[in-house]
């Protein structure tokens, strides 16, 4: 039984590391201009990152293989997929005005390095401290909704700045405050997100989906600012 558990534990690490393979093919798809493949690979990367931690805790991987730091492996994979690949995407694409590209890309790299190296990136009351480096979501939004350059410039600049500010960003699945509101609209937004990715929607439907997702992100931002003030004495 112990040998089986050990094999399963190693498989979890391999599963986490498979995100690096996804990252490699994501870079190749960017270079080849195959954004349809990039979109699917980005979603696969999000799925891997979303479940590998739960699997590791369930199988007690840390106890079985103490010589491998699963958290570090996960962070290496995440930095590549959540930060470095989006930087390549935005630098090589036409999603940001040319004169701002390098500044934005440097801002993304440095702000993410700051976030990933923080030991207090997540608070004790289940918030992200500062913008949580979800730059791959910008990749998805730009592929599906063809965001305007000025919209990208403004929103990405705000996210870079808030990476260094101790604002508490809602962790949708864990933050207790406003949970009864956050969970339902998160589920609805995710469903719309998935449908937008894997279905051929009309122009009108895409505009509606875009509006819903923008409102969702606006809610998360405004609610985070409000809750930062409300929980400031914790």
From Swiss-Prot:
It comes from the Bacteria. Coiled coil: none annotated. Residues 25-26, 97-98, 148-149, 202-207 are periplasmic. One of its GO terms (biological process) is phospholipid biosynthetic process. Keywords: Cell inner membrane, Cell membrane, Lipid biosynthesis, Lipid metabolism, Manganese, Membrane, Phospholipid biosynthesis, Phospholipid metabolism, Transferase, Transmembrane, Transmembrane helix. It holds the Pfam family CDP-OH_P_transf. This is Phosphatidylcholine synthase. It is an enzyme of class 2 (transferase). Condenses choline with CDP-diglyceride to produce phosphatidylcholine and CMP.
């Amino acid at each position: 039984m112990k040998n089986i558990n050990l094999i399963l534990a190693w498989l979890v690490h391999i599963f986490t590391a498979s995100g690096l393979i996804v990252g490699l093919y994501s870079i190749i798809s960017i270079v080849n201009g195959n954004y349809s493949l990039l979109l699917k690979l980005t979603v696969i990367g999000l799925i891997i990152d979303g479940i590998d931690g739960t699997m590791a805790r369930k199988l007690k991987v840390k106890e079985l293989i103490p010589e491998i730091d699963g958290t570090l492996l996960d962070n290496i994979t995440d930095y590549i997929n959540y930060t470095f690949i989006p930087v390549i995407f935005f630098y090589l694409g036409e999603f940001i005005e040319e004169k701002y590209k390098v500044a934005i890309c440097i801002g993304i790299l440095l702000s993410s390095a700051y976030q990933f190296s923080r030991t207090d990136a997540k608070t004790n009351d289940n918030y992200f401290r500062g913008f949580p480096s979800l730059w791959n979501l910008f990749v998805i939004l730009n592929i599906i909704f063809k965001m305007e350059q000025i919209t990208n410039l403004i929103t990405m600049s705000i996210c870079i700045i808030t990476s260094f500010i101790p604002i508490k960003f809602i962790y949708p699945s864990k933050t207790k405050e406003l949970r009864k509101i956050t969970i339902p609209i998160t589920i609805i937004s995710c469903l719309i997100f998935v449908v937008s990715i894997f279905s051929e929607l009309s122009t009108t439907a895409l505009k509606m989906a875009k509006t819903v997702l923008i409102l969702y992100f606006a809610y998360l931002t405004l609610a985070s600012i409000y809750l930062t003030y409300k929980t400031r004495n914790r």
